[in-house]
């Protein structure tokens, strides 16, 4: 190697979380994960992302698994590698803001069960929605990584990103992630952004993107050359398409350069061999849609994430209005502008997309308004980077007064009430958190868990006479 300073790029492996969430609807089971943990642990990853995001909901709802049990089993298996999770700020892993006591307890239990790095983001980049989670992570001595939800638009200048990065560092974050959920960050823009951020903050910078638009590997190359510290990749059987660039490809790309990871390709090949049959089985069963493996250039042309494109298509199909697809795509940026130009990530992408569909199909803008659109305009999700369109706001919410405080400031502590509601099913401390996020799904799971242990199906019980089937 030339006499250049060695600065190996660090790699976060997403195969146990975002890769299968992006390609097979988060359906990888704990049983499928555990046999390969020993080999994954030998690679030398900066971290393995294995929890949070949609895995919590999917484990309970579709796999009848306890997500906490999965985490404990993974922690037992990974002796040398840090475990990472994705956390939706004040929304935790759910779809609404929770009271601070629930957020703090969730962070505490995540760390206690084995999570080392907590990646925390907010769909509006409203830092007020992140503060409680960051402070809780600091208190638990977990690594608090705050993610910038990357997007494009007039408001999102280099100055915007450097200013918010500085505020994140001051807030107590241990590192920053550029979270490019839609694959919109182009290679040369990555050079500019990473260079500017490295000049602004001292904490490490991680880049997370998706291959949806086809540019992700080139973006990683330019970002690493510009000084990014960490990149997120997926083992090749679940890489590319809606997932991340392939781990093996990025490792080979940086071989014999100052950024050489030093990873063993033979070991990576053995890991890929393990996951390939799981991928093939998902293809055969239809769980893995071949469309999720290709490049969707519309993502770049319309600045709309891949998941949002498929969502719009299915909404229009239901209404027998597929011919309105391009009208809706043109309406999306207009609605986004009306709503303060939020990044298009869960849940803001669904809110903007659905409203755009209504506007086109009704033949009049904002004739029909969703509850979620009203809530954004009422400040219930937090502050947007730009002001709302005042005419649209007036039409949608009338004389209702928007809130300007942090949404969670209006919430009373919830834990005690939640504990009371699910006490009869509680088998571990963490159960109250499962119930807090998904009450109905949790109750169904608790009953299933009980039935597995007692071999009594509660649904088949004659409760009136206290009789149970054998």
Predicted regions and their residues:
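Glycine-rich phosphate-binding active-site loops on the catalytic face of alpha/beta enzymes
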Residues: 120-123, 180, 226-243
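Active-site beta->alpha loop and helix N-cap motifs at the rims of alpha/beta catalytic domains
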Residues: 47, 52-169, 176, 183-187
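Terminal or standalone catalytic/regulatory effector modules within metabolic enzymes
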Residues: 41-59, 289-299, 303-470
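C-terminal helical cap(s) of enzyme catalytic domains, especially alpha/beta-barrels
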Residues: 239-261
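N-terminal amphipathic alpha-helix/helix-capping segment at the start of soluble metabolic enzymes
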Residues: 1-24, 71, 76
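Catalytic cores of alpha/beta
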Residues: 156-168, 213-229
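Conserved, mostly hydrophobic/aromatic
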Residues: 11, 19, 40, 120, ...
């Amino acid at each position: 190697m030339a006499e250049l300073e060695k600065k190996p790029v660090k790699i976060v492996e997403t195969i146990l979380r975002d890769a299968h969430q992006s390609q097979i609807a988060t359906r990888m089971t704990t049983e499928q994960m555990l046999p390969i943990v020993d080999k994954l642990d030998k690679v030398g990853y900066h971290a393995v992302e294995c929890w949070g995001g949609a895995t919590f909901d999917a484990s309970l709802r579709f796999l009848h698994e306890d997500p906490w049990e999965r985490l404990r089993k993974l922690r037992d298996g990974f002796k040398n590698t840090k475990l990472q999770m994705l956390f939706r700020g004040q929304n935790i892993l759910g779809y609404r803001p929770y009271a601070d006591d629930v957020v703090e307890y969730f962070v505490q239990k995540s760390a206690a069960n084995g999570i080392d790095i907590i990646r925390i983001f907010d769909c509006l980049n409203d830092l007020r929605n992140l503060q409680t989670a960051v402070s809780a992570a600091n208190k638990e001595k977990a690594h608090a990584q705050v993610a910038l939800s990357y997007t494009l638009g007039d408001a999102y200048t280099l100055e915007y990103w450097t200013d918010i990065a500085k505020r994140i560092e001051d807030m107590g974050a241990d590192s920053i992630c550029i979270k490019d959920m839609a694959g919109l960050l182009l290679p040369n823009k990555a050079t500019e952004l990473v260079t500017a951020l490295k000049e602004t903050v001292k904490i490490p910078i991680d880049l997370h993107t998706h291959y949806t638009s086809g540019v992700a590997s080139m973006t990683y190359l330019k970002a690493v050359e510009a000084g990014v510290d960490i990149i997120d990749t997926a083992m090749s059987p679940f890489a590319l398409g809606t997932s991340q660039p392939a781990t093996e490809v990025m490792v080979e790309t940086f071989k014999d350069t100052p950024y050489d990871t030093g990873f063993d390709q033979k070991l990576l090949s053995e890991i890929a061999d393990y996951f390939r049959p799981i991928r093939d089985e998902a293809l055969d069963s239809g769980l893995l849609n071949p469309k999720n493996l290709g490049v969707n250039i519309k993502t770049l042309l319309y600045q709309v994430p891949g998941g949002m494109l498929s969502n719009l298509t299915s909404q229009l199909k239901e209404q027998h209005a597929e011919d309105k697809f391009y009208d809706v795509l043109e309406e999306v940026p207009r609605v986004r502008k009306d709503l303060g130009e939020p990044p298009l990530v869960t849940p803001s992408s669904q809110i903007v997309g659905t409203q755009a569909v209504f506007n086109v199909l009704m033949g009049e803008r904002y004739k029909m308004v969703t509850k979620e659109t009203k809530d954004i305009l009422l400040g219930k999700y937090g502050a947007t980077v730009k002001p709302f369109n005042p005419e649209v706001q007036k039409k949608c919410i009338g004389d209702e007064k928007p809130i300007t405080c942090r949404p969670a400031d209006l919430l009373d502590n919830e834990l005690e009430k939640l504990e009371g509601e699910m006490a009869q099913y509680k088998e571990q401390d963490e159960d109250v958190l499962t119930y807090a996020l998904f009450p109905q799904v949790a109750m169904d799971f608790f009953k299933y868990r009980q039935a597995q242990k007692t071999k009594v199906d509660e649904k088949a019980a004659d409760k009136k006479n206290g009789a149970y089937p054998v």
